[in-house]
UniProtKB/Swiss-Prot annotation:
Keywords: Acetylation, Cytoplasm, DNA-binding, Endonuclease, Hydrolase, Nuclease, Nucleus, Phosphoprotein, RNA-binding. Pfam families: Translin. It comes from Cricetulus griseus. Ring-shaped heterooctamer of six TSN and two TSNAX subunits, DNA/RNA binding occurs inside the ring. The lineage of its organism: Eukaryota, Metazoa, Chordata, Craniata, Vertebrata. The gene is TSN. DNA-binding protein that specifically recognizes consensus sequences at the breakpoint junctions in chromosomal translocations, mostly involving immunoglobulin (Ig)/T-cell receptor gene segments. Seems to recognize single-stranded DNA ends generated by staggered breaks occurring at recombination hot spots. Belongs to the translin family. Residues 177-198 are annotated as: Leucine-zipper. This is Translin.
Length: 228
């Protein structure tokens, strides 16, 4: 094979990969659009009357996750399953965002942390790497950390809306998250930076709870703070 033939062959490989990446980008753009729609829907809980609409907003968000499943099913067909991490960078951030949105819905519904397995059911993907398109553990953890930041904001807006017990529940939840993350030996630099922000979320919520206890707005809050 001549030098020119070698490079012609290589160009064929490069062109084929570029085609794959372009197809992936198209699906990811659709995923990002749907994620924005879900986020806009859920952001409404921060408004004055938003707390009354939580069940309705969560139900609507779950309907949007049906569209997410469709997009992810399409994404799976765009590349060989064994090359997941070769193209992972294309969908990593939107997948983390979708984990956060799924976790936010579950928290608003039950005030519990969604498991990685439950997220994969919501998104219609696999929990295990061996089964193909899956939810990477670090992507799951990143989404959970985004949730913590969102909940710290929610604690402040809860007070504005006159819901004085919610910040206490959020404080308990975020402190449990913090304790859980302390058990992990995080090697990923991006994930570690996100985790560094968790302590600020914890502090922000604790300040809200403390302020409520000082002002006597909530007996449950005051009693809990008195036990510390």
């Amino acid at each position: 094979m001549s030098v020119s033939e070698i490079f012609v062959e290589l160009q064929g490989f490069l062109a084929a990969e570029q085609d794959i990446r372009e197809e992936i980008r198209k699906v990811v753009q659709s995923l990002e659009q749907t994620a924005r729609e879900i986020l806009t829907l859920l952001q409404g809980v921060h408004q004055g009357t938003g707390f009354q609409d939580i069940p309705k907003r969560c139900l609507k968000a779950r309907e949007h996750f049906g569209t997410v499943k469709t997009h992810l099913t399409s994404l799976k067909t765009k590349f060989p399953a064994e090359q997941y991490y070769r193209f992972h960078e294309h969908w990593r951030f939107v997948l983390q965002r979708l984990v956060f949105l799924a976790a936010f819905v579950v928290y608003l519904e039950t005030e519990t942390l969604v498991t990685r397995e439950a997220v994969t059911e919501i998104l219609g993907i696999e929990p295990d790497r061996e089964k193909g398109f899956h939810l990477d553990v670090e992507d799951y953890l990143s989404g959970v950390l985004i949730l913590a930041s969102e909940l710290s904001r929610l604690s402040v807006n809860s007070v504005t809306a006159g819901d004085y017990s919610r910040p206490l529940h959020i404080s308990t939840f975020i402190n449990e998250l913090d304790s859980g993350f302390r058990l992990l030996n995080l090697k990923n630099d991006s994930l570690r930076k996100r985790y560094d922000g968790l302590k600020y979320d914890v502090k922000k919520v604790e300040e809200v709870v403390y302020d409520l206890s000082i002002r006597g707005f909530n007996k449950e809050t005051a009693a809990a703070c008195g036990e510390k």
